Structures are given as C-alpha cells and as structure tokens.
C-alpha cells in the first residue's frame, strides 16, 4: 500500500482513489485496416496513478465479411454475372465497387471466367500511400428457361457456327 490508512473513505471510490466508469468513445477507424488489426487511442484509458497521465485504449478490429466482395489484404475480388450476349458481342458493364459503381469493358469473345484487373480500385493501404486493386471475374449466366421462340433462334444461330468459331474444341 501507500502506508496510509484512509479514516473516512468517500462513498464513490471507497478510498481507492479511482472510480470505475463505463464510457463510450468515438474513434476514427484508419482506412484499410484489416481483421485482427488494432489501433491506439492515446490518453483515453484508465486514469493514471497519483495524478499521472491516463493510459491508452487499444482497439481490436473485426471486419465483417461483405456479401458482394472478397478481400485479400488490400485487393478486392468480385464475381459478376454477365449474359451470353454480353460475353459474345462485348459490352460495358457496371460493377459495384467499394467507392460506388465502376464501368468495365468486356471485349467481344471474352471467355467465361475471365478476370479483369482495375488498378487502384481496392482497399486503401493503412499508411495512406496508394490502394490495392479490384479484380472482376465475369461468369456467363446461362438462362434456365427459354421460350420456344428463343430456343428456335438459338438453334438457328448455332447452325451458322463452324468449328473455326471455337478455339478450345479444336483437337477433340
């Protein structure tokens, strides 16, 4: 102890010199912080002893997974469904990003599963110097039901194609 006995301890601290108080703190979470990382709130912790400076609060971060994006360090990945026509004819698609919407040019004849890299569209580095990349993987979504007219049109179209239209089928 301190070598002193408190004869009339106060009702708040009972002679300990400190009072336990629950307190809500506001903090700016650093951009780019990842799961299981943390940051310090200096001077926001418990009161110091004998009038010394207050301690620090260490904040441990848990990042909630996104339903749209996958994250690997500072890179963001998204799988985006495109139509057969967009795949064959090419198109500009609008894809969600962490900053809102972004346009991606899908060239004519793009194969299903092709991934496009968008530089600097990922998560900001914690040190604030640059950002990761965003990767957009295009997957062709095949319609589950076709009308009779759609079926006939597709068969007619298929009849116009030759083996030369298919690179991967050559040799089988």
Label the model's feature ranges.
Residues 4, 8-12, 18-172:
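Charged, often glycine-enriched C-terminal and inter-domain segments
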Residues 1:
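Short, intrinsically disordered, charge-biased short linear motifs at domain edges
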